[in-house]
Structure formats: structure tokens, C-alpha cells
Amino acid sequence: VMESDGERSREFYFRTAPIDGTDFTLIHGGDSRSGHANRCRMNLRIAEQATSNPKVLAFAHGGDYIVSGSKWEQWRLWLSQHELMTLEDGRVLPIIPTKGNHDGGNIYFEVFDLEVETKRWHTTMLGKDVALVTLDTNSPGGGPQAEWLEAQLKRLRPAVRWLLVQYHRPMYPAVKGPAKHAPIFCPLFDKYNIDIALESDGHCMKRTVPIRDGKKDPTGIIYVGEGGLGVGQRKPDGNRWYIKDGGKTGSAHHVVRLDFTPDNLRVRFVLMDASAWDDHTIKARKF
């Protein structure tokens, strides 16, 4: 509740992640910077998912909220349209933010109450069993970020059951070339056996085959996403080795729905019309 100049807002609330390992759901999506009408439709779709499934607890955004990160009027419009994600009873989904390449300047840090120098990358614990590590593909991958990443992964694995990472530019893209961070990040992902990597930026849909050491491996990591929260969708290249023979690509506005249980992580691409484009299950790793 907010109160200012004698005016009082309606009451809002959110739900925290369960501490006892109970099932819950996380929504992920990126690239809402353009296509404002479709951005609004996707916000309503997310709200509908949270209304129909009370286990949806939070929304992880993969970056590129707006076109120009230094323009407050664009942020103001994004924030206003984001209110469509509020449920009728006042429940809101906390945002776990990622910085995109269009989100330059300091307004991003002000909007999400992050320290400019220390919160470009951060870890969010969702209960005791799920950790989401957020990285910044706009900052150098080596040096402080790589050191921080390895320290986090070493601390979290095998302590948590599910270990996820999110960042903006893909390591195994379906449209563009790979992020320059791939030679630094991917070996650490492999070393500490993360479960899934959530990507944006390509404006398409993608699920790779499981990858380890730069090749297909059943023990490897699946990279999913590429961003469909409003932007026009691009045509992906389905002939890349990490997509053929078990992966999948497409073009449609979407979010990625992640359903966590003690034994399985169910990953679904949900389209604007509520249909599922892909439905994939990852089993918990044994240590």
C-alpha cells in the first residue's frame, strides 16, 4: 500500500517461494522493447497464467524492456503497461530483472532498485531448492564477473536441487552469432552442472539439445528462450548443430513457463493464444 498527499492506493501483495520444496512455477520472457500492442497482450497472457495457476510466483525478464534505456518516457510507458500483469485481487509477480543491450544508462538500476556498480549480476533464491543466477552480457565476461560467477556456482552446487542462469545475449543462438561471453561462461556452466540457461535477444523461440563441452551430450545443458514479449519475431536458423536432431526453433510471441517439482523441471513455451509450442522435461541431477 502507498499513501501520498492524503491519497491511498489499493492493496497489493505477492507470494514468496515455498521453503519446504513444494511445487511452484516461474515465468521467463524477454524483449518487450517494441510492438507495444503485443507487449500488452503478452502481459495479459502472463496475468491469465498466474490467475489460473496460483503456483506462478514470479516473472524473470530477460532484458530489452524498451528501445532506449536512457529515455524515461519509454520506461514510464513500460511500467504503465506492466500493470496489466496485476491480478484482479491485487497479487503481483515480483520481477527478477536482466539487463539487455537496449537498457543502457542508469534508469534500469533505478527502476529495479539495483546498485549500479554491484548489482549488474546477482543471485535470487526461490525457496531453498532453486537458485536463479543473473548475468550481464553487456559487461565483460572475464575479470570480476567470471570470478563472481564461479564463486556463486561453487557455493550453490550441489547445495540446491535446481540451478538456473539467465542473461540477455545467447551462448548458442538461433539467429545471431554467439555472445562473446560464451568461451568464459559455458565452461563454468559445464563445470558446475547448471540445469538450464534462459536466453533472449534473438526474437525467436529455441530449445537446444543438451550441450556439454561444445557438443551434444545427454548430461549437458539445455539453452532455451530468445525473447518474444512483444518484439517482431525473426526467422531462426534450424540447421545449426545444436538445434538439429533433438532441438527446436520457431517464431511466435511467447513466454517460457518453468514448473519446479522435487524430481522434474517442466519447460514449456506458452504462446499468445495460450497454446504450448514445446513441452520438455528435465530430470533433477544426481550428486
Regions found by a protein language model. Name each.
Residues 22-98:
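Conserved, compact domain cores that house catalytic/ligand-binding motifs in diverse enzymes
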Residues 31, 63-64, 100-101, 135, ...:
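Active-site glycine-centered loops adjacent to acidic/histidine catalytic or metal-binding residues
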Residues 1-13, 72-159, 184-185, 190, ...:
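Extended active-site neighborhood of metal-dependent phosphoesterases/phosphodiesterases
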